Amino acid sequence: LVGSETLNLSGTGTIASKNVGSNKTVSLGTLALADDTGLAANYTLSGGTHQLTVNQRPLNATLSRQYDGTTTAAGSTLSSFDALQGGENLTMTGSGTAASANVANGIAMSNNGNLALVDGTGLASNYSLNSTVINITQRVLNSSGSKTYDANTNALAADITLSNLVSGETLNHSGTATIGSANAGSYTISNLTGITIADNAGLASNYTLTGGT
């Protein structure tokens, strides 16, 4: 452009490949000049050199896993990316470090340089990893127990043992559950809503009875 003159540009051109790269030749397509501080009639796109650089698109990743008592956040627990294009998908390898081991959403992560994007239906080279957070969900507890026949379907907390706790952690539990029959035999604990878990050597907020066996 001459001096400080400027023009507007509208329309769409095309490049031979959608992938990241520098100085890709642009076919003009419907690209057209329009007046700004200069007159479009004084210029032409024909015969010029037209290039486009395609840069990596930054992605924010969310990982998700159950509580396991550690701050390790593996790329294999990927839940979602925020900005994949055209229905593409990617995976991740490696691991980072969560700021907390406890249950929460959107926990910040460090050591993200140890995480790597991996090709899926899209190319990892077209993207860069901008930030990563992890959602740590409650660990599902299982329960079992035994009691002596007492003609009712109640199962007291003292009759019930909790399992699937993280190694070295314990919880207190209280209340009453319900079993399928008052008679002697093996039954599923059908209703645990009356059982409450509480902190001991572990945090009750990191666990749930819902969905367990």
Regions found by a protein language model. Name each.
Residues 1-213:
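Short loop/turn motifs that initiate or flank beta-strands
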